[in-house]
Swiss-Prot record:
Gene3D superfamilies: 1.10.8.60, P-loop containing nucleotide triphosphate hydrolases (3.40.50.300). Residues 144-158 have a biased composition (Basic residues). GO terms for molecular function: ATP binding; ATP hydrolysis activity; preribosome binding. This is Uncharacterized AAA domain-containing protein C16E9.10c. The lineage of its organism: Eukaryota, Fungi, Dikarya, Ascomycota, Taphrinomycotina. Belongs to the AAA ATPase family.
Length: 779
């Protein structure tokens, strides 16, 4: 029994010791109270940390707590004494004085006298004026040092905060190109209330409290807010929304309140919250209760920014996001984020302005055609154009290194590769050492270790060809987001299909190029076009040509890629496509294999597929505005598409892309063989009217030309490849290769029509069913 009682006492002492050590560490870090604490304070602390200690009798608990406090005090004494011993020993080593060594004992005596005061019940009862003075002076000095430390810390924090609230000075609105409409709207909504609040007070108009900037990544939301702050010259609070989130309960809401309180104290003030969707998601879909509390705190703080609560000094909030639909709906109502400004993917004219603005700080050489460069950068946002400029600069530097230090001026004898050449070998005047760019740059750095002089820097400049080469190295962010760059297919790449070209020009291309003409006759809603017909007849090629001709943003969607096995994800993907298109209008959406997305709704169709059909129907002709968004769909099974897709207002124009006739086959062959060298004996007119081409589609004719070219290449170059004689093969490759009639005859044996007579009759019956559409197309 005695052993068990001893072990219990040790366990109790160990528990209390752990709790009091944590209390001591906390006090030393925060300095909110003095150490050592009283026995009563220690008992209160350990009972709060461990509920089981409340069941122990008070005398026993007091005895153990006092014992642990004495132990901790002794540890502090030893550390203090050892630190002072070290200080005195170091000073003695420097002075080499024996008299100073005796001061260690006196210091220890003083330490003991001071630490003995800790166990006394009341400092006032201690005798000795010297001890009182020493203790009082030490406590006063310690508290003064702590106050001084706190004041210095707080002062440095305040100075840092004040420095961060200055508006950025490295960018202005004149440095931004292609966003003229957005800048004018921001000046109206933000600059006017901040600069002239008296106008709103006099007229009794409530100015907007918040403006939401949304658009694809890299379009300039953050840069626009920084430039506006510099233009206004008012205190600017810029915060990243994820930095508000804290792991401690209540800390996130506290940070939100502190930021808004600081903004009101600095009023007139402009606040910018980047990636605001990270902290204000929809409350019904929030994963944690903390997210709901943060949203509620944001709503409350936004309501407190009225003129009445800010003493007539305006505080405006600008939020930025690329996912506006994920924000809580209460945050987007009037009185909070009153206005929303959409920064779209820049058009060709906007890209030209952006490039001209970026070129102001560059050293360019030659005649730059910014208009042509803007045409070659469809889908590029401001960040992509900046990356393009940087890539062009790197290419220019590599080129200039080669020009400044040509290979014949470098010390070629130092290259070890020359030592490996045989003595009887010599380089001709036209020969050069095959060095790569890395070796050129390395040799240049070795030859010029010092900074270049102004005379050497003079030839450094970026030429137009550097930008052309950089286009292949920079991928637009919109392409990673689901956009496709404008295809390099024009009407010249398409043979025949002239009647369908005219219909597509009237339905898609001209409304984008000349919208005022259509508005003058009352046509405002965009048209949807359904291209249907046998496979391989050029439906996808037509859509690419339309996108290229209109110079609009282009989104290519293959029907099955939007389908998802999770509930609601397919519908969300459909909505996201139209959301991106509306943000980048004018935009052409091309749905390939539409029958996979919108099959006919009946009892056999699953509920998930029905929801996808309903979502697409409402996006095409629902409550949401579809201005500037044009839809082209392609299918070879129009009979299984839901009939509601084909009513007016959706895909109301159906165009049959049928198999080409004899005359159209000749035109297609002429287009396909522009890059193929043909023998004089080849007659494309006879070839296109051959009976064996009766059911050939455009894709079949392309396969025929490709197979004939491969046959000619095999007979001219690779005839001896099986015998493993590369020298003969290399010699044969130097001879001109031309495709002959014999090559086409061999190709006819391998290429068969992809559409049978039975399939063609089926499409003819479908064309009769839609007689009105097919008759117009046939004309």
């Amino acid at each position: 029994m005695r052993r068990s009682g001893t072990s219990l006492s040790r366990d109790l002492e160990r528990k209390i010791h752990e709790r009091l050590v944590s209390l001591k560490d906390t006090i030393q870090q925060t300095e909110i109270e003095e150490w050592p604490v009283s026995t009563r304070r220690a008992i209160q602390f350990v009972q709060e940390r461990d509920m089981s200690l409340r069941r122990i009798k008070k005398p026993i608990l007091e005895k153990v707590v006092e014992k642990v406090l004495d132990t901790l005090k002794a540890e502090v004494e030893e550390k203090l004494a050892s630190s002072q011993d070290l200080v005195l020993v170091d000073s003695d080593m420097e002075e080499q004085s024996d008299s100073n060594l005796m001061e260690v004992k006196d210091t220890n005596v003083i330490n003991k006298s001071i630490t003995s005061l800790w166990s006394s019940p009341n400092l006032k009862e201690i005798d000795g004026e010297d001890e009182k003075k020493s203790v009082g002076q030490e406590s006063i000095t310690g508290s003064a040092k702590r106050k001084d430390r706190r004041s210095k810390t707080n002062g440095s924090k305040r100075q840092k905060a004040e420095a961060n609230r200055e508006p950025p000075s490295d960018i202005s609105l004149s440095d931004i190109g292609g966003l003229d409409d957005c800048i004018n709207e921001l000046l109206e909504l933000v600059a006017m209330p901040i600069k002239h609040p008296e106008v709103y007070q006099y007229t009794g108009i409530h100015p907007p409290r918040g403006v939401l900037l949304h658009g694809p990544p890299g379009c300039g939301k953050t840069m626009l807010a920084n430039a506006l702050a510099n233009e206004l010259g008012v205190p600017f609070i810029s915060i990243s929304a994820p930095s508000i989130v804290s792991g401690m309960s209540g800390e996130s809401e506290k940070k939100v309140r502190e930021v808004f309180e600081e903004a009101k104290s600095l009023a007139p003030c402009l606040m910018f919250i980047d990636e605001i969707d990270a902290v204000t998601p929809k409350r019904e879909s929030a994963q944690r209760e903390m997210e709901r509390r943060i949203v509620a705190q944001f709503l409350t703080c936004m309501d407190e920014l009225s003129f009445e609560k800010t003493d007539g000094k305006p505080v405006l909030v600008i939020g930025a996001t690329n996912r506006p639909d994920s924000l809580d709906s209460a945050l987007r109502r009037a009185g909070r984020f009153d206005r929303e400004i959409c920064l779209t993917v820049p058009s060709q004219d906007a890209r030209e302005k952006i490039l001209r603005t970026m070129a102001k700080g560059l050293k360019l050489s030659g005649d730059f055609d910014f208009r042509q460069l803007a045409k070659q950068t469809p889908g590029y946002v401001g960040a992509d154009l900046k990356a393009l400029t940087a890539a062009a600069g790197i290419i220019a530097i590599k080129r200039i290194f080669n020009e400044i230090s040509p290979l014949n001026k470098l010390d070629l004898n130092s290259d070890p590769r020359f030592n490996e050449l045989d003595s009887d070998m010599a380089l001709d005047s036209n020969d050069s050492l095959p060095l790569d760019h890395s070796s050129i740059i390395q040799r240049y750095l070795n030859a010029h270790p010092d900074p270049l002089s102004p005379e050497e820097l003079e030839p450094l400049a970026i030429c137009p060809q550097d930008f052309i080469e950089a286009l292949a190295k920079v991928q637009p962010s919109s392409k990673r987001e689901g956009f496709a760059t404008v295809p390099g297919v024009s009407w010249n790449n398409i043979g025949a299909l002239k009647s369908i070209r005219v219909e597509l020009q009237m339905a898609i291309v001209q409304p984008i190029k000349r919208p005022e003409l259509y508005q003058s006759v009352g046509i405002s809603a965009p048209t949807g076009v359904l291209l249907w017909g046998p496979p391989g007849c050029g439906k996808t090629l037509l859509a690419k040509a339309v996108a290229n001709e209109s110079k609009a943003n282009f989104i290519s969607i293959r029907g099955p890629e939007l389908l998802n096995k999770y509930v609601g994800e397919s519908e969300r993907a459909v909505r996201q496509v139209f959301l991106r298109a509306r943000a980048s209008s004018p935009c052409v959406i091309f749905f390939d294999e539409l029958d996979a997305m919108v099959p006919r709704r009946d009892d056999s169709l699953s509920e998930a597929s029905s929801r996808v059909v309903n979502t697409l129907l409402t996006e095409l002709d629902g409550l949401s505005d579809r201005s500037g968004v044009y839809v082209i769909a392609a299918t070879n099974r129009p009979d299984i598409i839901d009939p509601a897709m084909l009513r007016p207002g959706r895909l109301d124009k159906t165009l049959l892309v049928d198999l080409p006739d004899a005359h159209e086959r000749v035109e297609i062959l002429k287009t396909l063989t522009k890059q193929t060298p043909l023998h004089e004996e080849v007659n494309l007119d006879v070839l296109g009217r051959d009976e064996r081409c009766s059911n050939f589609s455009g894709a079949d004719l392309a396969a025929l030309v490709r197979e004939a070219a491969v046959t000619a290449l095999r007979s001219a170059v690779f005839a001896d490849i099986a015998s493993n004689e590369p020298e003969i093969t290399q010699h044969s490759a130097l001879e001109p290769i031309r495709v002959t009639n014999a090559d086409f005859e061999l190709a006819f044996k391998n290429i068969k029509p992809s559409v049978s007579d039975r399939d063609r009759q089926k499409y003819q019956r479908l064309a009769k069913r839609w007689s009105s559409a097919s008759t117009n197309d046939a004309d």
